[in-house]
């Protein structure tokens, strides 16, 4: 869609909003339209504020920077991240693992993506591989609130027998 808009010189810009990808159209008269690309609906500032408060925090505020244009890499990463979450939700762990590996191509040392890959490996019963990734996350992000849960999972995995695949 963005490629077609670019070829037709349409002022359609991708925006990585905190809750999802949205599209921004800047009209020649200065008016800005925001569109939900999943259903084509026009989005008001009120709707974006509701999304923030419902998905992020009741005290979250909408800032103009939330509507900044995203570059192609950001869009691809967001789409892959959304795909990975959907695949994990659907228990399609092999595909989720491939998606996680693709995301790691952008930033191979991202502790959060390495954590996610470790969680996927654990779901695939590849605990010995999961241990490395989960331990890396805890080492890199000891203050992250989820680190304590990951430590418990590491302890649980460490006490299991290793199954060779």
Q: Residue spans of the language-model regions?
A:
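A structural boundary/capping signal
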Residues: 2-165
């Amino acid at each position: 869609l963005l490629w077609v808009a670019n070829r037709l010189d349409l002022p359609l810009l991708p925006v990585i909003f905190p809750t999802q990808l949205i599209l921004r159209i800047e009209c020649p008269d200065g008016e800005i339209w925001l569109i939900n690309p999943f259903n084509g609906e026009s989005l008001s500032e009120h709707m974006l504020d509701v999304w923030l408060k419902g998905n992020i925090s009741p005290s979250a505020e909408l800032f103009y920077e939330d509507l900044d244009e995203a570059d192609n890499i950001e869009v691809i990463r967001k789409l892959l991240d959304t795909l990975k979450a959907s695949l994990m939700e659907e228990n399609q762990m092999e595909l989720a693992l491939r998606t996680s590996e693709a995301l790691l191509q952008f930033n191979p040392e991202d502790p959060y993506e390495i954590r996610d890959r470790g969680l996927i490996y654990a779901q695939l019963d590849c605990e010995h591989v999961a241990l490395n990734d989960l331990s890396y996350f805890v080492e890199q992000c000891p203050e992250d609130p989820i680190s304590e849960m990951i430590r418990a999972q590491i302890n649980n995995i460490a006490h299991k027998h290793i199954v060779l695949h």
